[in-house]
Amino acid sequence: MAHPVRVGVGGWSFEPWDETFYPPGLSKAKQLNYMSRKMTAVEVNATYYSSFKPDTFAKWREASPDGFVFSLKAHRFSTVRKTKEDMKKSVDMFLGQGITSLQEKLGPINWQFPGTRKFDAEYFKTFLSVLPKEIGTGPAHAGGGHGG
């Protein structure tokens, strides 16, 4: 089975890109629309730090062309909880904020664990057990690690 190769960046609003990547005078509100026509995917780092409303995800979907994919970074609190119950609450809160409003443009979800976390097989087994098998229209993606 062939899989498409996607090219993207981690975000779309970077001051150093104003008037270099983006055309002069392009408003911040139009940067996603422009970038999504030059690339095929984006990793949304903002979801690691904040929650968003379903309308925001829907606006992102509408601003990007067919075939474009959003890879969301799960909220930072999702991967630091100590008990299964707290893990489930955090995961459910992240998944329940309206990410399925991205519909077919919802791509992989990056569950980034702190680089300081020592490997504990039981911890990761427990964490993986609270993830749903599917979200909306596609599989729930689980990834780990903390790249430099």
Over which residues does each language-model region extend?
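Residues lining hydrophobic/aromatic ligand-binding pockets adjacent to catalytic sites
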Residues: M1-G148
